[in-house]
């Protein structure tokens, strides 16, 4: 990861931390880390700490193309895992449409980027079951094609999950 990318991502930390206080939410999960994903695999983060309604915000950046899948049920995630294991699941759920997307080339940064919401704020979630946030580097679901002998995906993940604390 080059210096510009690191500095751009590092400046988001304080903003995300104070946003939880200003908007009335409590940060229950935060990931800010570089990840390495082998071709044909995915990196998963389980989201289960939210008690009822909450909010989610993420930005993922990498030099290679990738997909983001956000599964709202263990059953949907199990289909994804089965696919990665070489099985042929009966279906390949695309994940929640509000959060699942392909990384798009950002001309200014010369990196691929996926973020939700697209304005950099937060989007509402309701966690009844464990949710799964996946940075995918496989050929799952007709997403971004990945060659078998491609280099590993080197990405930076900035993921924040908030629990609503305002009275209704």
List each model region and its residues.
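Terminal disorder- and signal-encoded targeting elements
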Residues: 1-168
């Amino acid at each position: 990861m080059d210096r510009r990318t690191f500095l751009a991502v590092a400046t988001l930390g304080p903003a995300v931390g104070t946003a939880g206080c200003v908007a009335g939410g409590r940060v229950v999960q935060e990931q800010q880390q570089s990840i390495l994903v082998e071709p044909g695999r995915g990196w998963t983060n389980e989201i289960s700490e939210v008690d009822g309604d909450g909010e989610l915000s993420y930005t993922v950046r990498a030099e290679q193309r990738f997909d983001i899948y956000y599964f709202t049920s263990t059953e949907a995630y199990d289909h994804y895992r089965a696919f990665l294991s070489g099985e042929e699941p009966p279906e390949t759920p695309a994940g929640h449409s509000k959060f699942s997307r392909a990384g798009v080339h950002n001309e200014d940064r010369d990196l691929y980027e996926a973020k939700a919401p697209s304005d950099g704020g937060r989007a509402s979630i309701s966690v009844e079951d464990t949710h799964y946030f996946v940075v995918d580097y496989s050929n799952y679901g007709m997403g971004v094609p990945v060659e078998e002998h491609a280099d590993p995906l080197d990405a930076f993940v900035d993921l924040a999950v908030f629990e609503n604390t305002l009275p209704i």
